[in-house]
Amino acid sequence: MSPQIAVNTAVTRAELLDFISPRHHAIVITTRADGTPQASPVTCGVDDGKIVVATYPERAKVRNARRHPQVTALVLSDDFGGPWVQVDGTAEVIDVPDSIEPLVGYFRSISGEHSDWDGYREAMVRQGKSLLRITPERWGPVATGGFPPRLA
């Protein structure tokens, strides 16, 4: 059996968003007050060219992003051994009531249409949901793990 060779593929912004759109698992990395990294596993989508994450205002990632909006999202494939990409960007935190329509976009980007949008909106208000919206500014290549090519 041939070894799997690591691959790195440079992508444009459009190709990046096409890669991320069907992938909904990510690790968002923010900066704590003491300067150390804080990582949060999240479900993410792409809406209007930005990576979106539903969250709550009291979560560490939200507190950190408000203080230091430069964040990183490591977007993973469903298959852990599948391709992934690191995206660096600026995060914006949107709280209720302004978060409600962006949360609709978040839901649509992951699951499509909801059977009860009024009920969904009411639940988002009741839960006090926030949206973390990350504008991609820099990204690495789409990568896969494996052996270096010299070992092929």
Roles of regions detected by a PLM:
Residues 30-32, 76-78, 113-121:
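A short, aromatic/hydrophobic, helix- or strand-capping loop or linear motif
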Residues 20-21, 66-67, 125:
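Alpha-helix boundary recognition
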Residues 59-61, 80, 148-149:
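Short, surface-exposed beta-strand-loop junctions and turns on beta-sheet-rich folds
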Residues 24-25, 70, 115, 139:
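Generic structural signal for secondary-structure transition and capping sites
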Residues 23-57, 63-65, 71-75, 84-87:
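Short beta-strand segments
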Residues 2-27:
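Short, basic/aromatic recognition patches
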Residues 1-11, 83-152:
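Charged, gly/pro-rich active-site loop segments
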Residues 16, 61-62:
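Short, hydrophobic alpha-helical packing/hinge segments within bilobed ligand-binding/sensory domains
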